A protein has these predicted regions:
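C-terminal cap of thioredoxin/glutaredoxin-like
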Residues: 5, 14-31, 102, 110-210
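A short, charged/proline- and glycine-enriched loop
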Residues: 1-2
């Protein structure tokens, strides 16, 4: 059985779409998934980048694209009332609700759908209180231990060469994005073409640096 680490942030529409699409992408393959919520902003800061929603034209394109992708994949999808938003409360809630080391699929699904279905504000205080009551976290989301878990997960993601969300890590390789799901499936199937493209990337000489 193959083990997949799924790095995600609830702020990302692509992470939500990939979360919903993953079971449909891997039927018939023996695998297990560990869900690892991380702070996408931490990755961006580490690499000196702006988020997609922080660049005006890219923001507009992203929202159009994810709405289209949702319809193409048959996934219920609504933009929240405002985006981007601060996802820390949701990320900490996920880790606080983890009863066996990492959050399970139900926890992540519940939080993702809180954000990406219905079109309501993701960070509305009353909605967050209701979400917390629904998940009944075993730990206080505001506790130092929970904050540590989120920081540790983000640091571990960086150490694993994760640079964005959604990212799937398996067999020491990282697969980034919703559109990487077919390549991820090929890796799990043992398709030798994946080895070929991996080797090709390493053979390209570093060109101009800015």
């Amino acid at each position: 059985m193959k083990h997949i680490d799924f790095y995600l942030d609830f702020i990302s529409p692509y992470a939500y779409l990939a979360f919903e699409a993953l079971p449909r992408a891997l039927p018939g393959l023996s695998h297990e998934v560990t869900y690892r919520p991380i702070l996408f902003a931490g990755l961006l800061k580490h690499h000196g980048q702006l988020g997609p929603a922080e660049i005006g034209p890219k923001r507009d394109w992203t929202y159009r694209h994810v709405l289209w992708q949702g319809r193409e994949h048959g996934i219920a999808f609504d933009m929240p009332a405002a985006h981007p938003f601060n996802p820390l409360a949701l990320l900490r809630l996920a880790w606080a609700s983890a009863r066996q080391g990492t959050p399970n699929r139900y926890v992540c699904e519940t939080i993702f759908r809180h954000v990406w279905q219905g079109g309501a504000p993701a960070d509305d205080v009353a909605r967050l209180e209701a979400l917390t009551a629904q998940l009944a976290p075993a730990r206080d989301p505001a506790s130092d231990a929970v904050k540590h878990d989120l920081r540790a997960a983000t640091d571990a993601a960086l150490a694993a060469d994760v640079f964005g969300v959604p990212t799937f890590a398996v067999d020491g390789r990282v697969f980034w994005g919703l559109d990487a799901l077919p390549l991820l499936r090929a890796q799990l199937e043992g398709d030798t073409r994946v080895d070929e493209v991996w080797a090709c990337a390493a053979s390209v000489a570093q060109g101009v640096r800015r």
